[in-house]
């Protein structure tokens, strides 16, 4: 599989070939993904919740994102690597936003993703001007869950719906190459997808986007809580627990290690 590029992303919209994206946070996972036909890896700030054990993503730092981006990049996957910009790494001013975006690219990402709507237009323009591709993110934006009143579906009111449409158009105009739409109503996501020339990637926003993204822990059945919009394709939590329990039994009953697991001196 050849390296997936920004151009490939945009082409898939015109050919109506669905884009597939999953999160990954470490070398082993990225190495497995590299041997699949997945289009893109998102080094998401969701690592704060599913890897580091935080209650939300607000505690994730640039140091965290750089470290995990490097780990994923070391697997040298052909997938397009997109790294999240963490909370307060891009909101303060455009200068620090460009600098932090550059640090993620130096760590191995092919593009960065940031949350927010029209208020992020100047920031997006500055990062794109610096030569760094930007993926937008609207709808439920986890870094802003306090302002949004919690993790909820966005677009219930006409005002929210109109704002989502406006945000998507403003971000496209600012130069984002793609747009994540999270946890909004399916008809709104469909309208946005039809209005934009750039590909949309849905998570909890229905089937009419140009692609889908999931947190890999949800897909693999590893999460403590799986949101309604995610699908578990395997229950790795159960498989891993069974393996650990079998190991305990084998050790306690002297069934491990067996002869093939150690060496004896020749007599």
Curated annotation (Swiss-Prot):
Q: How is this protein annotated for GO cellular component?
A: cytoplasm
EC number(s) from the headed UniProt entry? 2.1.2.11
Q: What does the entry's cofactor note say about binding and number?
A: Binds 1 Mg(2+) ion per subunit.
Keyword Transport among record annotations: no
Question: Sorted alphabetically, which keywords does the UniProt record give?
Answer: Coenzyme A biosynthesis, Cytoplasm, Magnesium, Metal-binding, Transferase
* Functional note: Catalyzes the reversible reaction in which hydroxymethyl group from 5,10-methylenetetrahydrofolate is transferred onto alpha-ketoisovalerate to form ketopantoate.
The record's GO molecular-function terms, alphabetically, read: 3-methyl-2-oxobutanoate hydroxymethyltransferase activity; magnesium ion binding
- What is this protein's record name? 3-methyl-2-oxobutanoate hydroxymethyltransferase
State a single Pfam family of this protein.
Pantoate_transf
What does the organism's lineage look like at the top? Archaea, Thermoproteota, Thermoprotei, Sulfolobales, Sulfolobaceae
Give the species this sequence originates from: Saccharolobus islandicus (strain Y.G.57.14 / Yellowstone #1) (Sulfolobus islandicus)
List residues binding 3-methyl-2-oxobutanoate.
45-46, 84, 113
Q: Which cofactor does it need?
A: Mg(2+)
Q: Which reaction does it catalyse?
A: 3-methyl-2-oxobutanoate + (6R)-5,10-methylene-5,6,7,8-tetrahydrofolate + H2O = 2-dehydropantoate + (6S)-5,6,7,8-tetrahydrofolate
The residues the record assigns to binding Mg(2+) are 45, 84, 115
Active-site residues annotated for this sequence: 182
Provide the GO biological process annotations: coenzyme A biosynthetic process; pantothenate biosynthetic process
Q: Which PANTHER family match?
A: 3-METHYL-2-OXOBUTANOATE HYDROXYMETHYLTRANSFERASE (PTHR20881:SF0)
Subunit structure and binding partners:
Homodecamer; pentamer of dimers.
């Amino acid at each position: 599989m050849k390296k997936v590029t920004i151009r490939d992303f945009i082409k898939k919209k015109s050919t109506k070939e669905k884009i597939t994206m999953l999160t990954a946070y470490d070398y082993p996972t990225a190495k497995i993904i590299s041997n699949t036909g997945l289009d893109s890896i998102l080094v998401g700030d969701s690592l704060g919740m599913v890897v580091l054990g935080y209650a939300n993503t607000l505690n994730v730092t640039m140091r965290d994102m750089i470290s995990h981006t490097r780990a994923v990049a070391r697997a040298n996957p052909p997938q397009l690597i997109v790294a999240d910009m963490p909370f307060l790494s891009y909101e303060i001013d455009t200068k620090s936003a460009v600098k932090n975006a550059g640090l993620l690219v130096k760590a191995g990402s092919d593009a960065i993703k940031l949350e927010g709507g029209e208020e992020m237009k100047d920031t997006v323009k500055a990062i794109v001007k610096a030569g760094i591709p930007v993926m937008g993110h609207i709808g439920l934006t986890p870094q802003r869950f306090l302002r949004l009143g919690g993790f909820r579906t966005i677009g219930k009111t006409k005002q929210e719906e109109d704002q989502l449409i406006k945000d998507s158009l403003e971000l496209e105009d600012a130069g984002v190459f793609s747009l994540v739409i999270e946890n909004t109503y399916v008809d709104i996501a469909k309208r946005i997808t039809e209005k934009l020339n750039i590909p949309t990637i849905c998570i909890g926003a229905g089937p009419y986007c140009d692609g889908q993204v999931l947190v890999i822990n949800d897909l693999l059945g590893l999460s403590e809580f799986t949101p309604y919009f995610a699908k578990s394709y395997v229950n790795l939590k159960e498989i891993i627990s069974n393996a650990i329990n079998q190991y305990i039994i084998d050790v306690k009953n002297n069934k491990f290690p067996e002869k093939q697991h150690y060496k004896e001196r020749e007599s």
